[in-house]
Amino acid sequence: MPFAKGARIEIENQTDVNIGAFYYYIDYVEMKELPKDMGRFHAWFNREITEALPEGETEWGSVGKQTENKDGADNYVFADIKGKGHFVGLNYYVQCPTPMWYGEGDDMWFIDGEKQASLIGTGTEDLFNTAWCPKEPYQHIYFGYPRVNNDVGFLGRTHVYRFFIQDPVFFEKGLKATIEHGHNNCLTLDLATVAYWYQDKATAVPTIPDKAGRKLKPMVNNVMMHKWRHEWRKNKGNKADLWGNE
């Protein structure tokens, strides 16, 4: 985290609990001057409860025909940068309220004001160097799945990360980095991200949500799912032998 004139790091307790002790240490190196091309480190937290399509959560064609995402206008935005720099990392947190796979969403990178993305991925897990709907914890220096939920399908909370140290995304004028929430943004998800990049100069980042805006949605559990089944049974006339695939 290079700095030329000074740096300030603040830690704020936004919980309702008093912290009796707080331990930390900071290492830094003093230099007479920085290299001329040394960028400035930036990080930005974003969160959104995404909205499903009007026709429903049609992932994998399970409840309706899948449609095409032609422009990425409704994608989740994890970086919206103005200026020159290079993108170096992403922490991605997803809470999925359905057992359906959350990761068919493609990443789309709009570089230097592009109207159409020049970098388009093939799925959320592919962006994080994995494949085939991973459900096992795995951690590497540059990518990993430190948290997964193996209760019921993909219901629950998952955390993945990737650092683009060996393959940064460069931009001259700006970068808008986005990802679909499900195929063509068909899923309601609780998404949160922290993006990391370097710019040629220190630049203010977009305002992050306040404490209330960062509060997670409650977990959907097996009891809630059974209540959904109960309502489905009532809609089917409460026949005694209803199974679930009628």
Specify the residue positions occupied by each region the protein language model found.
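Beta-strand-centric surfaces of beta-sandwich/beta-rich domains
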Residues: 1-246
